[in-house]
Amino acid sequence: WETITGKLEWTEAIRGCDGVVNLAGAPVATRWDKKYKETLVNSRLGCTKRIADAINKLPEKERPSLVSASAVGYYGTTRKDEAWTEARGPGGDFLASLCEKWEKAANKAKTNVTVVRTGVVLEKGGGALGKILPLFYLYSGGPVGSGTQWVSWIHREDLVDIMIMALKNPKKFKGVVNGVAPEPTTMNGLCEAIAKATNRPNWLPAPGLAVRVLLGEGATVVLDGQKVVPEKTMEKGYQFKYSDVNSALDAIVNGP
């Protein structure tokens, strides 16, 4: 978003729009140092503040609704089996604090705001699977860390459809919804589903210590997790296409 700063008046860019979707944010599943943590913050808060300001400059009746991304990192991490809903408060780590600030920035917009706390997005061409699938095809795939950590995931089609539904029903979807599938899995469960879909073995784990050496503090994204369910999302009427990870992976790997 920084590349268009000064080249485009954002308020004029959104004038006449029914809704705005904000997905801006630097990747978290990489090595963090002090400078990159600043990038994680600025890439989210800077853009979101600009969008909220642009919306607020419009007359009230002309303001579009806002669908703004957040992440399940808002809740912190746990190894417990308790399922967390949208009602749970924020955790106490860096990502939780970042998500909390990110959401507050979005809610500065004086319009109907939907915050989507997104889990691990499964898609063939990128994201987590973009890094994991090639390893399985090379017969070298396996769980990262202990394998028992929770993975709250969502198929990309479901995430897109949730956001579209929020755009079409801004008053109904005002507030927070979890962008995760109804059936979270573990890292082992995810890798077993990948192995089944690719017809490859799930046998070569990546030790947690090695991942921490490689990613530093950023390793928390893949080594720790949280069991999150989309209670409010379903209460608002969304019906998931992919509720279980096996059907999602089969569609991604073997679908058209």
Where are the predicted features?
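SDR active-site strand-loop-helix element
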Residues: 20-24, 66-72, 116-118
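C-terminal amphipathic/interface module of NAD(P)-dependent oxidoreductases
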Residues: 220-256
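NAD(P)-dependent short-chain dehydrogenase/reductase
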Residues: 93-96, 111-115, 119-151, 156, ...
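Conserved Rossmann-fold NAD(P)-dependent oxidoreductase catalytic core, especially the SDR/UDP-sugar
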Residues: 49-93
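Glycine/proline-rich active-site loop of Rossmann-fold NAD(P)-dependent oxidoreductases
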Residues: 122-131, 165-177
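NAD(P)H-binding glycine-rich loop region in Rossmannoid oxidoreductase-like domains
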Residues: 1-50
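Mid/C-terminal beta-alpha module of Rossmann-like enzyme folds, strongest
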Residues: 162, 169-217, 250-256
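Catalytic helix-loop patch of NAD(P)-dependent Rossmann-fold dehydrogenases
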Residues: 42, 78-115
